[in-house]
């Protein structure tokens, strides 16, 4: 395709060249301009080809393969899935047999992962939200449940059937009835329970909560100090709106958001009336301290982690080691084959183990909140020549995060990241994957780099053409 377009382009350039060469004046400058145009056309063609290849990289494997190869792939994946879930499907008291994920479901999950990675916040919200409430005035508003919110930021979590982009469960507004259903959406001690009378998440809430989850604690501390003009450690509502507006503009979600008046997903204010009441009281004249806000961030992280834990259907308060491993690797970006292999090895090693409690899981994720300090501490150990074994990890957790990691949690982590089986941690890979897990993938740019590439190409073409036309003396 690019060759066919290239031939007439060259012919046109040749004709223009002959025309320019017929004129004696400024021949050298014109030749430079022609060379610049030729280089620019070549660069655009090559870059377009690379972008086309990148955009269709995932689709090529399914398009170009023959039906026979596709069928064999399906059979192989189904067989692998059956092997992986064989132990989980053993009859147990009070546990429902889990349905096996099929070939079609995997393709749907791949599509939904691309929505999470590259779509605008507006589209992500409209795809994963499941409720549409019609008010007495006839106006409607779309809401997420807490489970929808967790699903929207967790890879490989499939949206329920018949619910997708602009497909919702319709509810007529009845304040008393909906408020009575609040317990279905969140526990009374949950942050989500405080989101309005319904305990549901609006679009403004969604943007605010993703901002809180994707921003390190240190960034909020600095922003609060910048707007705390009198130094008393408190900010009012207007100052806090400025703080969170600046923080939001630095996140990938905030940079990608554009108000959509047609869908109603606009940010008229920084956050909803329910959250303003939560932070500043009913009269909105209260003050918010950095301590109280960081406590809100901690509780939000706790509630989201609890929902993730419960999605694995714990038995007697325990999830399997393989399920814990999948939580750790959910945002790793590891290739599917390698990921499947790592989880299989984990399952074989802990086939008859007792599993992990939520307290053990939460302690490890508290350890991850200090991952930058952990990275520094492990680097000191490495430079000192000490091995990064389980005892070292437990010591770092006690020193840096003030938590106690159980021996069993350390065994599972080392089973995942001890690549050569010598009982020592692969520090570089562990830290890189855990940083991605901590931010839940929300810090990644929500685009494929096309706009940035085109801007760089345009700037390069301008500078190149100028250098050819006006060479330095």
Swiss-Prot record:
The keyword Protein biosynthesis does not apply. Residues 1-33 form a transit peptide. One of its GO terms (molecular function) is calcium ion binding. Residues 61-101 are annotated as: Disordered. Ca(2+) 1 binds at residues 228, 230, 232, 234, 239. Its main location: mitochondrion. GO terms for cellular component: mitochondrial inner membrane; mitochondrial intermembrane space; mitochondrial membrane; uniplex complex. Residues 123-126, 256-260 are annotated as: K/R-ring. Residues 66-79 have a biased composition (Basic and acidic residues). It comes from the Eukaryota. Residues 96-107 are annotated as: Polybasic region. Coiled coil: none annotated. Residues 215-250, 405-440 form the EF-hand domain. One of its GO terms (biological process) is mitochondrial calcium ion transmembrane transport. Residues 80-91 have a biased composition (Acidic residues). Calcium sensor of the mitochondrial calcium uniporter (mcu) channel, which senses calcium level via its EF-hand domains. micu1 and micu2 form a disulfide-linked heterodimer that stimulates and inhibits MCU activity, depending on the concentration of calcium. At low calcium levels, micu1 occludes the pore of the MCU channel, preventing mitochondrial calcium uptake. The EF-hand domains have high affinity for calcium and act as sensors of calcium levels. Lysine and arginine residues in the K/R-ring mediate electrostatic interactions with mcu and play a key role in mcu inhibition in absence of calcium. Heterodimer; disulfide-linked; heterodimerizes with micu2. Component of the uniplex complex. This is Calcium uptake protein 1, mitochondrial.
């Amino acid at each position: 395709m690019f060759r066919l377009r290239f031939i007439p382009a060259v012919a046109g350039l040749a004709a223009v060249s002959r025309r320019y060469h017929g004129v004696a004046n400024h021949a050298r400058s014109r030749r430079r301009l022609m060379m610049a145009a030729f280089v620019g056309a070549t660069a655009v063609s090559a870059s377009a080809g690379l972008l086309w290849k990148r955009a269709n990289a995932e689709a090529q494997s399914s398009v170009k393969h023959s039906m026979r190869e596709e069928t064999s792939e399906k059979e192989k994946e189904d067989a692998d899935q059956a092997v992986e879930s064989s132990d989980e499907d053993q009859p147990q008291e009070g546990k429902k047999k889990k349905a096996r994920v099929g070939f079609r479901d995997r393709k749907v999950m791949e599509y939904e992962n691309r929505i999470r990675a590259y779509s605008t916040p507006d589209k992500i919200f409209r795809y994963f939200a499941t409720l549409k409430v019609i008010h007495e005035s006839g106006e409607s508003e779309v809401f997420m449940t807490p489970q929808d919110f967790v699903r929207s930021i967790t890879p490989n979590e499939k949206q329920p059937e018949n619910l997708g982009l602009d497909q919702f469960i319709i509810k007529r507004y009845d304040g008393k009835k909906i408020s009575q259903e609040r317990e279905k959406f969140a526990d009374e001690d949950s942050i989500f329970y405080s989101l309005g009378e319904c305990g549901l998440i609006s679009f403004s809430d969604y943007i605010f909560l993703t901002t809180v989850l994707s921003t390190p604690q240190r960034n909020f501390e600095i922003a609060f100090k910048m707007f705390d003009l009198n130094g008393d450690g408190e900010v009012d509502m207007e100052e806090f709106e400025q703080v969170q507006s600046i923080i939001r503009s630095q996140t990938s979600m905030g940079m990608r958001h554009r108000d959509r008046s047609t869908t109603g997903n606009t940010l008229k204010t920084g956050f909803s009336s329910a959250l303003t009441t939560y932070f500043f009281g009913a009269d909105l004249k209260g003050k918010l301290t950095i301590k109280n806000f960081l406590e809100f961030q901690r509780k939000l992280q706790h509630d989201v982690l609890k929902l993730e834990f419960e999605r694995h259907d714990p038995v007697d308060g325990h999830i399997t080691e393989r399920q814990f491993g999948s939580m750790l690797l959910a945002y790793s970006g590891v290739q599917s084959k390698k990921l499947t292999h790592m989880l299989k090895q984990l399952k074989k090693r802990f086939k008859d183990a007792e599993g992990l409690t939520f307290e053990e899981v939460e302690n490890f994720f508290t350890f991850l909140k200090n991952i930058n300090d952990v990275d520094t501490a492990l680097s000191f150990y490495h430079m000192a020549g000490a091995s990064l074994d389980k005892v070292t990890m437990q010591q770092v957790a006690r020193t840096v995060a003030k938590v106690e990691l159980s021996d069993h949690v350390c065994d599972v982590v080392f089973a995942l990241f001890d690549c050569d089986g010598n009982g020592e941690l692969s520090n570089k890979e562990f830290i890189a994957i855990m940083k991605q897990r901590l931010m839940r993938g929300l810090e990644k740019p929500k685009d494929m780099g096309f706009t940035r590439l085109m801007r760089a190409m345009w700037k390069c073409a301008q500078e190149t053409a100028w250098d050819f036309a006006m060479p330095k003396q």
